[in-house]
Amino acid sequence: MAFYLEKDYFQDIELFNLLQQKAKGKELTLHWYEAKTERVRLAPRDPARGLTYEDCNVGSYGYDQLPELLRTNYSMAPRGAELWGTLPDLGYTVNRKSAVWADNVAALYEEAKARRWAPAVDLAWEALAQAPVPEVLEAALAQLCTFLQECAAGALGLAAHWLSRINQELLELKSYLCLQMLDQARHIEVLRKRALAGGQGLKRASVSAEQALKELCAAETYPAASVGGHLLLGSFLLGVYRQVAAVAPSPVDLQLCRLVVQDTARMVAYGSGQVRYHLAHQPQQAAFLQDYLDRAEHCLVGLMGSPECVEPLILLCGGGSAPEQVQGGSQRVARLQAGIVAEYLERCEGAGLRGRTERSRLPHYLKRSR
């Protein structure tokens, strides 16, 4: 929906005359000079890390002082600035701190900056040509890279969907979500380049995975989107990347997975912290999240059971396509899937969703499928 000002500044004679006077150095009001704001002088607590958001957590500028319900600022004004005049209402729909906050969000933001990497130069791409991966494994990698790009696009879209809806007072959280989007964009980049650099190109999109991702991205509230995107999807991706790192057919693939794992681990850490903070301040919402997961956990089945995911994983884990390799790979993938579910449920329990392990249909489903 478009927004139009009540006035056209091209037609504002008063503003034009004011600009003329200022250009001549006349009639400076300097009303901003004595703004009704808190004066502070900050210094890094750890010079090696520099001045961090945690160092800036002081007084009216800090996030600890934020109220639970954000009632006074719906504009773009930075937290701690003097609010005056008619600032626009941007229509934020997430105005409750405990709906989105996590105690570790400022630290995760700083970590994401400190550990940034560039796919173009931080991987030894030339090594792929010097020591090519066997064709069957290269094809499996290309398919898995295709699938994982779809997952990264889903995680990116989830963060992007909520970013403009969250009140600007929660600036550290919004800054972290921006870096999470950058992480996922970087994953799309590196996975695409890996598939194209190995001689195979991209393979086949996954219908079941994309349907599952769409459902997770369509969660009606941020807490539901977070538990579904950061814990459910994040646990799946973290498990897959760690497994591929364990069976990586080349040093390039090992380094790629190690770098992606550190980014994905941050996403999961934020998700755990967000759910924990949310339930600590709104314990009555545990029933809502439990009900949401009752309905959403089938999406993990759609991801894990996608032929475009499970089959290339079997070949990579087995080391090839010979019958005995497929058999061995299948067993390793079965253990991987069980591990993903167990770690996801453990994270839910640790975040405050007590009884999730007994309530979830995932363990029973996996047991029946073996």
Regions of interest found by a model, annotated:
Residues 1-160, 164-170, 201, 220, ...:
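Terminal targeting/low-complexity segments that flank the catalytic cores of oxidoreductases
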Residues 237-241, 275, 300, 340-341:
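Hydrophobic alpha-helical core bundles mediating ligand binding, dimerization, or RNAP-core interactions
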Residues 149, 155-217:
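Long, hydrophobic, well-ordered secondary-structure blocks that form the structural core
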Residues 139-148, 169-184, 226, 251-264, ...:
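Alpha-helical scaffold segments that form or flank carboxylate-/histidine-based iron centers
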Residues 148-156, 177-195, 227-238, 260-271, ...:
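Alpha-helical transition-metal enzyme core signature, strongest for iron centers
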Residues 157, 189, 193-196, 243, ...:
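Charged/polar positions within long, soluble alpha-helices
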Residues 256-260, 267, 272-296:
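A beta-strand-loop signature enriched in Asp, Gly, Thr, and Trp
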Residues 193, 197-265, 295:
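Active-site-proximal alpha-helical scaffolds that flank and shape metal-associated catalytic sites
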